[in-house]
């Protein structure tokens, strides 16, 4: 069976090569960015930026929102997250528990309408924008990937502030979040880049590969976005075609072997 499978894959690879014309990436400079191009293509919108200069539309609602199944603060209501973020937060909470830290979800997805109400209410009360409530469309929470996480003591407090960073839970999350695809979204020394004050409780799901790169290089999501966009621009200026690269790679990756027959025989299918 192994020989048959290998032979079929070689045959299909040859057919794909002849049908596609030039070899994968032929004539293009080598792709040397540390992350795969598919991650930057962001089909799943995991690295989508939401801030004052990258506003989400008023009707933007993630398609795969689910009710969260992790431990929640008593006043959290019925928070929702995108499916991947929900799976990841459950894994992170379980790992934290094993290390002796109990985490509580305080806030997750927030609609544009809710964010607008919160922003206007605070603006009317203070008479100014103090930066503590994001402008409508600029909230990380609207992506369905941003979360506020606290320990039990802090869920009982009226408000959140940077002193939460001194807790064991905050320190554990800052050290381990990337293992589950999360980043510390608003770092203490990145206020100039993010436009948001330090929030040791706010984490953002971006996927494990991007999270590892961002956290290991101590980047804000803004800096990461600027960096990879600049790389693609320079790569294309040198003769690359990012869209064509994605298309060609998707054709190669579309060759899969699946078992669909009653007798266990393998069949090869190609999906474009």
Residue spans of the language-model regions?
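Extracytoplasmic cell-surface/polysaccharide-interacting catalytic and binding patches
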Residues: 24-108, 112-272
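Sec-dependent N-terminal signal peptides of Gram-positive bacterial secreted proteins and lipoproteins
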Residues: 3-25
